[in-house]
C-alpha cells in the first residue's frame, strides 16, 4: 500500500514466516474427511442451539401477517392487471 508520502508498506519477513507456521499443524489440519464432516455437523448443532426460536404464539402471529400480506398483494396485482387490460382494450380497441 502507498501512504500519503508515497512510501510502500511492505510486510516484514518475520510476519510471513509466522503466518505460514500458524497455518500448518493444529488438530483440524490432521483430521481426515470423516473427522472434518463430524466437526462440521457439531458446529451446525452448536450454532442451532444459539438460535432464539419463536414461541407458538409468535409463530402464529407472524404466519398470519405473512398470509394477509400475500393476499393483499395478490389483490393489488389483480386490480392493476385488470386496469391495464381495460386501458389496452380502450386504446387498441
UniProtKB/Swiss-Prot annotation:
The keyword tRNA processing belongs to this UniProt entry's keyword annotation: no
Sample GO molecular function, one term: protein transmembrane transporter activity
Ranges for region Disordered: 1-33
Transmembrane annotation, as ranges: 64-84
Basic residues: bias regions: 20-33
Keyword hit for Cell membrane: yes
Subunit structure: Component of the Sec protein translocase complex. Heterotrimer consisting of SecY, SecE and SecG subunits. The heterotrimers can form oligomers, although 1 heterotrimer is thought to be able to translocate proteins. Interacts with the ribosome. Interacts with SecDF, and other proteins may be involved. Interacts with SecA.
Protein name: Protein translocase subunit SecE
Annotated source species: Streptomyces virginiae (Streptomyces cinnamonensis)
Gene: secE
Amino acid at each position: 500500500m502507498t501512504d500519503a508520502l508515497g512510501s510502500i508498506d511492505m510486510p516484514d519477513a518475520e510476519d510471513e514466516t509466522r503466518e505460514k507456521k500458524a497455518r500448518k499443524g493444529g488438530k483440524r489440519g490432521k483430521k481426515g474427511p470423516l473427522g472434518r464432516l463430524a466437526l462440521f455437523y457439531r458446529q451446525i448443532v452448536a450454532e442451532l442451539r444459539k438460535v432464539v426460536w419463536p414461541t407458538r404464539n409468535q409463530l402464529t402471529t407472524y404466519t398470519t401477517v405473512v398470509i394477509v400480506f400475500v393476499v393483499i398483494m395478490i389483490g393489488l396485482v389483480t386490480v392493476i392487471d385488470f386496469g391495464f387490460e381495460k386501458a389496452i382494450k380502450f386504446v387498441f380497441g
